[in-house]
Amino acid sequence: MAWFALYLLSLLWATAGTSTQTQSSCSVPSAQEPLVNGIQVLMENSVTSSAYPNPSILIAMNLAGAYNLKAQKLLTYQLMSSDNNDLTIGQLGLTIMALTSSCRDPGDKVSILQRQMENWAPSSPNAEASAFYGPSLAILALCQKNSEATLPIAVRFAKTLLANSSPFNVDTGAMATLALTCMYNKIPVGSEEGYRSLFGQVLKDIVEKISMKIKDNGIIGDIYSTGLAMQALSVTPEPSKKEWNCKKTTDMILNEIKQGKFHNPMSIAQILPSLKGKTYLDVPQVTCSPDHEVQPTLPSNPGPGPTSASNITVIYTINNQLRGVELLFNETINVSVKSGSVLLVVLEEAQRKNPMFKFETTMTSWGLVVSSINNIAENVNHKTYWQFLSGVTPLNEGVADYIPFNHEHITANFTQY
């Protein structure tokens, strides 16, 4: 899915005692392991006292085996200190799993989430698929803590999924698969067989839809939704009719890593577990070892040293034509920046040259997101946001990650999702 859709999920968020293991064909070749270790180090180094405390990163660190114990301890402390009132059900679910994977007691977070999910209902019968992402995380977290108490919640959630007819979303489908697989594997002995039948039916439906998103090159949806989809396809008790070539997917992801596509810490957190042979179902089985630093094996051939960068010109347009919004505009500016600069630098230079291009950002688990341009701000209630496009193609990276090329036309379009 497009980068913004992943960010949107962050706004809305956000086995029965046995360890799971991805299929052997998914194993990363030993020669490529330093490549995977390299992105893990990059992810762990993003953890600082001033950074957004991201539970997905802590889960990935613990499932993979953390290298940077100081970062691990800092992030654990930050999440333990988080205010439950500031968290959505998805964020609360992730935080519970992150603390569980750190062998820490989540305290009252579990009972709070339990109560919230008992009162949960979608906003409408055909709510967007992304509206089910946070509840999927919540059910997965609750399943790992008390599956029996979670059963009525999961049954209602599964029936709601069956009745929903909104367009399919790979990330949401993958997370729902993990949640319902946990419930399927933990149905109490002596319970009605109808529970297993219901969960199996929903899982079969979702997994078939995920399999329809597998591209010829192995990518599932897009490169940033592939990590969660790999987890889902590797553990589901209801495999799809279409065979999944896990090796092809793994090889393609490794190739994307070589090309530098995985440098955003959140994108690394979502792909790392699968590359390490783990899934979110392994969270309760993480063994917390005594404190000792582990030095990873990293790639031995560093890239070429820095060279003096030439300037490039980026054509930048801001556009708002939404009815009901007072200020309508379509303005274009040519901006000169150093080659290799991220899009954020382009926006800053445009703002310096013309106050009409003034913008504001918000920090999320996926990094900086542009929340306002020319005093027109996104609004969750109105489902409006600033979408960035290259030509007519939505960008799949954020402004702090995307690197524009010479004479590229970037448009920031105020639109609705």
Curated annotation (Swiss-Prot):
Gene Ontology terms: biological process: cobalamin transport; cobalt ion transport
Principal localisation: secreted
The UniProt record lists the keyword Cytoplasm: no
Disease annotated for this entry: Hereditary intrinsic factor deficiency: Autosomal recessive disorder characterized by megaloblastic anemia.
Quaternary state and interactors: Interacts with CUBN (via CUB domains).
Domain of life: Eukaryota
Record-given protein name: Cobalamin binding intrinsic factor
Phosphoserine carried by residues: S191
A Pfam family per the record: Cobalamin_bind
Organism of origin: Homo sapiens (Human)
GO MF annotation list: cargo receptor ligand activity; cobalamin binding; molecular carrier activity
Disulphide bridges: C26-C246, C103-C288, C143-C182
Family listed: Belongs to the eukaryotic cobalamin transport proteins family.
